[in-house]
Amino acid sequence: MKFKILLPVFVLFLSSFVTLEAQNKVEVNSKQVSQMLLKSKKLIVLDVRTADEFNAGHIKGALNIDVRQTDAFSKIDKLNHNGKYIVYCRTNHRSGMAVEHMMQSGFKKVYQMMDGFPGWAATNFAYEK
């Protein structure tokens, strides 16, 4: 009898964590990011590609933390967890790793740019080298 009561309570408890994480991570595209950046100067853009990729072109003002470096997650952890971040790479693999880590580390709001830097460049939005 107790098991029948506890199981639904436990499932509800676990689902609240999944919902909370989903609320903190939002998938966006480069057009949405462009609009967001025009509306708010408080957004922090995080490019998780290699330094060579970053130097070849990146969104203006972006921070570069190469997620494949051994110290990448410790660098990410030093960022303000209450900030609003837009994270991108080239194909979503590296940005996905970074976003997952950020969610597990308690970052409040993270946007993953799903079309990556190629999507940004293809729309002819300004970028810097």
Residue ranges, per PLM feature:
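Hydrophobic helical h-region of N-terminal Sec-dependent signal peptides
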Residues: P8-L14
